[in-house]
Regions:
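Short, glycine/charged-enriched secondary-structure capping and boundary segments
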Residues: 9-11, 40-43, 105-108
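A short SAM/SAH-binding and catalytic strip from SAM-dependent methyltransferases
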Residues: 1-8
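Short loop segments at secondary-structure junctions
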Residues: 21-22, 121
């Protein structure tokens, strides 16, 4: 849930700082900042967003607008930040969502999910 952090850049720096040499950082996330939580036209009728109500979806949008990471192009932003904090290789999987969301059910996530993996050198 990196996208919910008020200072993701600092978080990445701290994660890499405390990770021991040879340790693995895995991040599974999506570019939620680009999505409008209240846009439900492509969601199945049993999707969770229909159960939370418009007030909560609007609050989500207000909170998201305050988070700097919401204005970033992800995962490119994440990779750039990690490049500043590690000498290790960084692997990105931008097809993750296609493999884990095989059907549009109540858990379906329309934001394209990605994973990032790096090993601290």
């Amino acid at each position: 849930l990196t996208w919910t952090l008020p200072n993701a850049e600092h978080a990445y720096g701290e994660w890499m700082r405390v990770l021991k040499t040879g340790g693995v950082l895995l991040n599974f996330d999506a570019n939620y900042g680009k999505d409008d939580a209240s846009d439900t036209k492509d969601l199945p009728e049993q999707h969770a967003h229909f159960k939370v109500g418009n007030e909560m979806l609007e609050e989500c949008e207000r909170i998201k607008a305050q988070l700097p990471i919401s204005r970033k192009n992800r995962p490119a932003y994440d990779v750039a930040v990690l490049c500043e904090n590690t000498r290790g290789e960084i692997h990105i999987d931008q097809e993750l969502g296609k493999r884990i969301y095989l059907e549009k059910d109540e858990f379906y996530n329309p934001a394209p999910m990605f994973s990032i993996c790096t090993v601290k050198k």
